[in-house]
Amino acid sequence: MLDIKAVLFDCDGLMFETELISQQIWKDEARKLGFTLPEDFFINITGSGGEELNRYLSSIPNGMDLYKVMKKKRFDISFWSSIQKDCLNKKGLITLFYWLKQHGYRIGICSSSYRTYVEALLSTVSTPLEYDAIVGGDMVTHAKPDPEIFLVGAKILDVQPAECLVLEDSKQGIIAARRAGMHSCFIEDTIQPDHTMKEMIEYQTENLEEVIQLLR
């Protein structure tokens, strides 16, 4: 049994089924600009942000032009807020949040996306999720794989890093959790673990509901 006091959630692809929709938007917009995305594009950008994301996109021809378009389309609050209730929920989302609250765990949502975007996704859940903190990418200086976002989350929740379990679906997030000195659980969405990830993944489950078994 893990000695955990707080659970830190990533958002896109972990709590909500947004990655496939987002990936299609990236592909469509790249096509409009006249190029095809590299094969490793999504494993490099998923969960990333800030300088790390800018550095990668700058290495791709037309990458920054694409990013300017995507900043408007990908994070269109009105689009995500208008989606049918519970349509984006990942399996076990409501069950896990309810169980964690019933058992006294502190809950943080730590996403590379802006807080307003995270709140828009949360508004699509029919049963309001109870949580203790949201840390958005616009609230930190360094994006994942830097551990800052998770360390800020732990500080807000008043727990030690070693008392946190991070739930992630991205390479950048898993690396950030390790660097933060936290436990991590990988739940696969669109990214299959590469060699680096496999070395860093501590636990892995098929869905959010199975996380309960780790904590019992």
Predicted regions and their residues:
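A broad detector of the eukaryotic-type serine/threonine protein kinase catalytic domain
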Residues: 58, 79-80, 105, 136-139, ...
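A generic structural signal for short
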Residues: 14-15, 84-85, 107, 138-139, ...
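Short, flexible active-site loop motifs that bind/organize anionic cofactors or intermediates
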Residues: 32, 43-44, 83, 108, ...
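N-terminal helical cap/lid subdomain that shapes the substrate entry/recognition surface
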Residues: 2-99, 103, 128
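Asp-based, Mg2+/Mn2+-dependent phosphohydrolase catalytic module
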Residues: 1-5, 98-101, 114-216
